[in-house]
């Protein structure tokens, strides 16, 4: 059965809620994308915070509206901080999202991500290779790049969602978002989104922030994917290449509104 296409009208309504709430999003993300991630959250309407010291991370996870764990530049000290934050988020019922960057290529981060799954993420966002690997299936991948397609990883995403209780977003040319029972697809975007560093990581931050919203988590996560794809498509139409794409993307996300999405 083909997944239903996520409603842009629902995405527009969710964006209105998102901007009213402006979720305080604790981003424990990788060094390469911190600035772009923070700016993406601000442009979308959320409020970013980057707190990484273990003692502070534990404390802040209970204060934040949502938490992102991105293992892109994982170190042992950073893993300690991430573990402390997710443990506190679990206790405080702060929704947290896992971005298992390059989990299929490197053993240490794979073991770490599998350990964190016991702390019940609200959402997991990754490319096809990452989702396949996290689900325990063979995957092709070169670091953060994927050699698998999102649709090929959909059964793994559905199984992972049932196993963990998380909403799983496997993203690519078409994004698929599933809770293990219901699945929706999200279209849009542009190839330029793959020609700059950080769009996937920034998407994970917006997904994390969306998990702070009331209502259905699957719909909220799919809406976050929709906002990013619509902004990417709009920015590509105004860009001459990767260098002009990033500021155009932030502008497009900032100006995204209900009328443009319906």
Curated annotation (Swiss-Prot):
GO terms for biological process: thiamine biosynthetic process; thiamine diphosphate biosynthetic process. Keywords: ATP-binding, Kinase, Magnesium, Metal-binding, Nucleotide-binding, Thiamine biosynthesis, Transferase. Substrate binds at residues 50, 198. It is an enzyme of class 2 (transferase). Pathway: Cofactor biosynthesis; thiamine diphosphate biosynthesis; 4-methyl-5-(2-phosphoethyl)-thiazole from 5-(2-hydroxyethyl)-4-methylthiazole: step 1/1. Gene3D superfamilies: 3.40.1190.20. It comes from the Bacteria. The keyword DNA-binding does not apply. Belongs to the Thz kinase family. Catalyzes the phosphorylation of the hydroxyl group of 4-methyl-5-beta-hydroxyethylthiazole (THZ). This is Hydroxyethylthiazole kinase. It comes from Citrobacter koseri (strain ATCC BAA-895 / CDC 4225-83 / SGSC4696). The lineage of its organism: Bacteria, Pseudomonadati, Pseudomonadota, Gammaproteobacteria, Enterobacterales. The gene is thiM.
